[in-house]
From Swiss-Prot:
Regulated predominantly by intracellular cAMP levels. The 17,20-lyase activity is stimulated by cytochrome b5, which acts as an allosteric effector increasing the Vmax of the lyase activity. It comes from Macaca fascicularis (Crab-eating macaque). Pathway: Steroid hormone biosynthesis; Steroid biosynthesis; glucocorticoid biosynthesis. Its EC number is 1.14.14.19, 1.14.14.32. Belongs to the cytochrome P450 family. This is Steroid 17-alpha-hydroxylase/17,20 lyase. Signal peptide: none annotated. The gene is CYP17A1. One of its GO terms (biological process) is steroid metabolic process. Heme binds at residue 442. Keywords: Endoplasmic reticulum, Heme, Iron, Lipid metabolism, Lyase, Membrane, Metal-binding, Microsome, Monooxygenase, Oxidoreductase, Steroidogenesis. Its cofactor is heme. Coiled coil: none annotated.
């Protein structure tokens, strides 16, 4: 009996022990690992994973590998190596690993964010990029859409003058409407039941993905009851049902001679493909309703929670750093005033604000670890071999907190992005990739940067953002899920006296 058990264990150890494709090649240093469970017993059990991986660099260097279950994962924590993965060898490493929870979220690896490299991903990314080109000029100009929603946001916040509130939901509404207008040309009024549905499923999905699930490391575990997995499936179904409803209603009013949003772009591509008017890379099978809905879901999901979270981080850091906030008020008062609202062109004048946004994206990156990549071919990173199928994680936290690259990296210092005179924005380090880079870079970077700048410029022009009367400051610890979230906090909103006086003068 025991001999049989021992034989079975030896067989499993042989089957699951990592095998090198190139026996003579030099591979990254590796944590200890065991058959089946890999390096899991040897990883730190407390603290955030991105920080734990960063600490391991002191022992293993800026590139090392771990066995996550039965899969080899290479951790990259230096900007030169990261750029080799993302840019120089971007095609080699543009794949996505197959992960149980992400398969559910992406309707079995459709869409853009979690789809593997291939014709489908290339097509949908290209069509999404084409959508953003629609919003460069005219009535559909991106800036105009953003400012319309920010104006509504400011009007709503003004009704809470002198009150202490959580700004999460109001900011969520504004950003959701911007994305919704880009995706299918509709916006929601505050109190719309669909808006609550979007908010609830969004929170549910992020919460589910934030729980480190063993089923992602051991997919065979999905045959057993799993509350987190069931919760994720439930919220994804709610999302899919809502998007399907919007899609079906939209089909009735679609006109191929009026392309104004992402759904139009995708539907036109599908129609052209069905009619044989598309190129060879535009297979109609890759433009099924399910493919289209997943791509819309990707843009809708990724574009909302990320920007909402960064806005809250900015406000939180300003509450902790009143001297920076004071300088921002002075900068806006001197360069914009109160006779007009801020515009994107003010970026050249509101340098400290732009530097503040950049610093927040450094010190609290949207994703401390980028979505895992996968090697499509046998390749290398630096001097080390990387086998086909290897998972690669860029530890953005390590890049943004490297003491050799950043002076006092754990300190909030917007001035690091300005020259000594404060008259010019600078790039103090190459170790800065807040939106990733290369083929898998964030396609919504331009949108996100515009939203962050305009939202903060408008808020600071109109409102004093103050610590609540109870003195409770936001926690800056954060909660890294699929997005680096900040714990809920409240801020005291007061309409600025200078703004009120300017408005009173303008109305007389």
């Amino acid at each position: 009996m025991w001999e049989l058990v021992a034989l079975l264990l030896l067989t499993l150890a042989y089957l699951f022990w990592p095998k090198r494709r190139c026996p003579g090649a030099k591979y990254p240093k590796s944590l200890l690992s065991l058959p089946l469970v890999g390096s899991l017993p040897f990883l730190p059990r407390h603290g955030h994973m991105h920080n734990n991986f960063f600490k391991l660099q002191k022992k293993y260097g800026p590139i090392y590998s771990v066995r996550m279950g039965t899969k080899t994962t290479v951790i990259v924590g230096h900007h030169q190596l990261a750029k080799e993965v993302l840019i120089k060898k971007g095609k080699d490493f543009s794949g996505r690993p197959q992960v149980t929870t992400l398969d559910i979220l992406s309707n079995n690896r459709k869409g853009i964010a979690f789809a593997d490299y291939g014709a489908h991903w290339q097509l949908h990314r290209r069509l999404a990029m084409a959508t953003f080109a629609l919003f460069k000029d005219g009535d559909q100009k991106l800036e105009k859409i953003i400012c319309q929603e920010i104006s509504t946001l400011c009007d709503m916040l003004a009704t809470h003058n002198g009150q202490t509130i959580d700004i999460s939901f109001p900011v969520f509404v504004a950003i959701t409407n911007v994305i919704s207008l880009i995706c299918f040309n509709i916006s929601y009024k505050n109190g719309d039941p669909e808006l609550k549905i979007v908010h609830n499923y969004n929170e549910g999905i992020i919460d589910s993905l934030g729980k480190e699930s063993l089923v992602d490391l051991f997919p065979w575990l999905k045959v057993f009851p799993n509350k987190t997995l069931e919760k994720l499936k439930r919220h994804v179904k709610t999302r899919n049902d809502l998007l399907t409803k919007i899609f079906e209603n939209y089909k009735e009013k679609f006109h191929s001679d009026s392309i104004t949003n992402m759904l139009d772009v995708l539907m036109q591509a599908k129609m052209n493909s069905d009619n044989g008017n598309a190129g060879p890379d535009q297979d109609s099978e890759l433009l099924s309703d399910n493919h289209i809905l997943t791509t819309i879901g990707d843009i809708f999901g990724a574009g909302v929670e990320t920007t909402t979270s960064v806005v809250k981080w900015i406000v939180a850091f300003l509450l902790h750093n009143p001297q920076v906030k004071k300088k921002l008020y002075e900068e806006i008062d001197q360069n914009v005033g109160f006779s007009r609202t801020p515009t994107i062109s003010d970026r050249n004048r509101l340098l400290l604000l732009e530097a503040t946004i950049r610093e927040v994206l450094r010190i609290r990156p949207v994703a401390p670890m980028l979505i895992p990549h996968k090697a499509n071919v046998d390749s290398s990173i630096g001097e080390f071999a990387v086998d086909k199928g290897t998972h690669v994680i860029i530890n953005l936290w390590a890049l943004h907190h490297n003491e050799k690259e950043w002076h006092q990296p754990d300190q909030f210092m917007p001035e690091r992005f300005l020259n000594p005179a404060g008259t010019q924005l600078i790039s103090p380090s190459l170790s800065y990739l807040p939106f990733g880079a290369g083929p898998r870079s964030c396609i919504g970077e331009i949108l996100a940067r515009q939203e962050l700048f305009l939202i903060m410029a408008w808020l600071l022009q109109r409102f004093d953002l103050e610590v609540p009367d109870d003195g409770q400051l936001p926690s800056l610890e954060g909660n890294p899920k699929v997005v680096f979230l900040i714990d809920s906090f409240k801020v005291k909103i007061k309409v600025r006296q200078a703004w009120r006086e300017a408005q009173a003068e303008g109305s007389t």
